[in-house]
Regions:
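Fe-S-dependent hydro-lyases/dehydratases of central metabolism
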Residues: 1-227
Length: 227
C-alpha cells in the first residue's frame, strides 16, 4: 500500500546494497563479501539480486506500516513484519497473487525496466493507482502486470483500503479490452465485503495481446514457435 509519486527508483533502487537486505543476504550466501557488493545498478544482469532489490529502497513508505520508511511490509493474515521480498516469496508458497495499491503518478522518474521486471518476479499481478507515468504503465503491461486506475474520484483513502484486504478482479477471464471498466471485489479482515470499479489501463489492442500472453517476451516467443 503505497502513496503518491512512487518513483521507479523507489521500486527498483540503483544504489548500494545493504548487508542485511534480502539481496545482501543472498550475495553473502554466494560467498560475496560485503565490501564487494557494489550497487544494484552494477548487478542489473543478475535477476536474483534485482528481484530481491525490488521495493527495497530505504526511502519507500508502505502505508501498511504507518508510513514507516524501508522495504518492509505486513504479511496477511499472519501479521508478521517482513522484508517485501521475503513476504512475496511466502505468498508465492501460499499460491497467493499480489496487488499493489498506490496514489497518483505511480512509476515516475527514469524509465527503469527492472521496476516492471522485479514487480512481475515478486508475483504482483496488478497495480491499482490513481494515475500512472506513461512509460512505466507500458512496461508493466509488457511484463504481464495489469495497470488499473481508480475512477469517479475514488482513492485508497476514500475506499478505506488498508492493504489487509483480499482483492479479486472480475472479468479477466472474459477477454479484456482497452480502457474497459472492471469491477474489484474487496473482502476486509473483518469479513465485510464491498466493491469498486477501476479503469483498465491497457490502452491498445496490441497491449491486450501482450498481456494475454503473459508479457511481450512470451508473446514474441509464442509467435516464433507458431511459425
Amino acid at each position: 500500500m503505497l502513496g503518491d509519486s512512487v518513483t521507479t527508483d523507489h521500486i527498483s533502487p540503483a544504489g548500494n546494497i545493504k548487508k542485511d537486505s534480502p539481496a545482501g543476504r543472498y550475495l553473502q550466501e554466494q560467498g560475496v563479501e560485503p565490501k564487494d557488493f557494489n550497487s544494484y545498478g552494477s548487478r542489473r544482469g543478475n535477476h536474483e539480486v534485482m528481484m530481491r532489490g525490488t521495493f527495497a529502497n530505504i526511502r519507500i513508505k508502505n502505508e501498511m506500516l504507518g508510513g514507516e520508511e524501508g522495504g518492509n511490509t505486513i504479511h496477511v493474515p499472519s501479521g508478521e513484519k517482513l522484508a517485501i521480498y521475503d513476504a512475496a516469496m511466502r505468498y508465492q508458497q501460499e499460491h497467493t497473487p499480489l496487488v499493489i495499491i498506490a496514489g497518483k503518478e505511480y512509476g515516475t522518474g527514469s524509465s527503469r525496466d527492472w521496476a516492471a521486471k522485479g514487480t512481475n518476479l515478486l508475483g504482483v499481478k496488478a497495480v491499482i493507482a490513481e494515475s500512472f507515468e506513461r512509460i512505466h504503465r507500458s512496461n508493466l503491461v509488457g511484463m504481464g502486470v495489469l495497470p488499473l486506475q481508480f475512477v469517479d474520484g475514488q482513492t485508497r483513502q476514500s475506499l478505506n483500503l488498508t492493504g489487509h484486504e483480499v482483492i479479486s478482479i472480475r472479468g479477466l477471464s472474459d477477454g479484456i479490452q482497452p480502457h474497459e471498466i472492471l469491477e474489484v471485489d474487496v473482502k476486509g479482515p473483518n469479513g465485510v465485503a464491498s466493491h469498486f470499479n477501476v479503469l483498465c489501463r491497457i490502452d491498445t489492442l496490441n497491449e491486450v495481446e501482450y498481456f494475454k500472453a503473459g508479457g511481450i517476451l512470451h508473446y514474441v516467443l509464442r509467435n516464433l514457435i507458431a511459425g
